[in-house]
């Protein structure tokens, strides 16, 4: 019975602690019309200390969303446009000789910010991609002989254009796996697009975004997210979903066996659990339910399942495979 009381107390505490989520949503809603999935994805990444890979055609408010979030959180923001001639030093920084001090001084690169938008990450060679991915993983960079910690919170939002693949350097599977979430951004609805047009044509300009949260609040909120209760049944459900990507036959999904080249790694299980907790938190709840897991499952697994040539020949997507798994794995 004490556990039930604790859950009740925890739920009330999380309801109190997560008030800022609604304030943040309202602030983002001033500028971003629709795109609720994009906003949720940003909040989940921010609260679970994970990075996000976004796929969508140009002009869908990817840059606007992260700049608005940076303003609302009163955080530093930098945008890096990835191009074929970009060097790792352009990203992380370098040593520059100062005639004044007759010594080398450090000039830090744009990666030293709370929010980093890596625009069209697949336009730069592997050495630049790996420099960013190392910074994402280690939360620190080495310039010369010294190592520098990156600011907290640190969130990388990398974008890819799904249409133009000429002259690109696709991210290797091992690198893509470091992104906690991969979200696909879709076009707005008719009514939303009308609102966007009106907002941009009005003489008043874009509404001003107020600072409603501090980076320190986000770091504190992450600690609270870790306290969100996850029952053993939910843990088992998460493990079953990931195992179904590796051994579909064990879950009566024999038809998927020839379509999956490789399934999710243990990192996928960790990411799914963390994302489900963060999703429960932004829904102002102190415990995880199966719907939370299902809500984030596509974004967590989309880039972690490899398709065989047979699947590609039949135009089968990872989305269809994930949906099939969710429809067949027993929900607790």
Task: Enumerate the predicted regions with their spans.
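Walker A/P-loop
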Residues: 46-83
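Conserved C-terminal "switch" segment of AAA+ ATPases
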Residues: 13-18, 31, 168-169, 182-255, ...
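Pre-Walker A (pre-P-loop) alpha-helix and adjacent loop at the N terminus of AAA/AAA+ ATPase modules
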Residues: 14-60, 243
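Conserved AAA+/SF3 P-loop NTPase catalytic/coupling segment centered on the Walker-B
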Residues: 89, 110-137, 151, 166-175, ...
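Short glycine-rich substrate-engagement loop in P-loop NTPases that contacts/grips substrate
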Residues: 86-115
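C-terminal engagement/docking regions of AAA+ P-loop ATPases
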Residues: 1-9, 14-15, 248-332
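P-loop (Walker A) phosphate-binding loop of NTP-binding proteins
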Residues: 57, 91, 159
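AAA+/SF3 P-loop NTPase mechanochemical coupling elements
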Residues: 105-114, 143-160, 171-180
């Amino acid at each position: 019975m004490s556990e039930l009381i604790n859950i009740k107390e925890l739920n009330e505490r999380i309801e109190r602690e997560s008030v800022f989520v609604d304030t943040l949503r309202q602030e983002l809603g001033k500028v971003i019309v629709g795109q609720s999935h994009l906003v949720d994805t940003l909040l989940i990444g921010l609260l679970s200390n994970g990075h996000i890979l976004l796929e969508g055609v140009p002009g869908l408010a990817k840059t606007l969303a992260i700049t608005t979030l940076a303003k609302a959180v009163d955080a530093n923001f930098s945008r890096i446009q990835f191009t074929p001639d970009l060097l790792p030093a352009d990203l992380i920084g370098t040593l520059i000789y100062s005639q004044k001090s007759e010594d080398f001084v450090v000039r830090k690169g744009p990666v030293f910010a709370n929010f980093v938008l890596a625009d069209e990450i697949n336009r730069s060679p592997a050495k630049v991609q790996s420099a960013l991915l190392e910074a994402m993983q280690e939360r620190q960079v080495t310039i010369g002989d010294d190592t520098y910690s990156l600011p907290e919170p640190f969130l990388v939002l990398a974008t890819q254009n799904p249409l133009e693949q000429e002259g690109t350097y696709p991210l290797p599977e091992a690198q893509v796996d470091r992104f906690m979430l991969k979200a696909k951004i879709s076009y707005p609805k008719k009514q939303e697009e009308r609102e966007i047009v009106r907002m941009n044509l009005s003489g008043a300009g874009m509404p001003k975004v107020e600072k409603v949260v501090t980076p320190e609040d986000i770091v504190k909120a992450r600690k609270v997210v870790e306290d969100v209760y996850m029952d053993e049944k939910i843990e088992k459900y998460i493990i079953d979903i990931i195992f179904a990507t590796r051994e579909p036959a064990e879950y009566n999904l024999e038809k998927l066996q020839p379509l999956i080249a490789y399934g999710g790694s243990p990192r996928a299980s960790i990411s799914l659990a963390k994302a489900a907790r963060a999703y429960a938190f932004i829904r102002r709840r102190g415990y995880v339910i199966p719907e939370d897991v299902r809500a984030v499952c596509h974004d967590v697994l989309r880039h972690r399942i490899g398709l065989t040539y047979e699947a590609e020949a039949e135009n089968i997507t990872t989305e269809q495979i994930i949906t099939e798994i969710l429809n067949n794995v027993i929900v607790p």
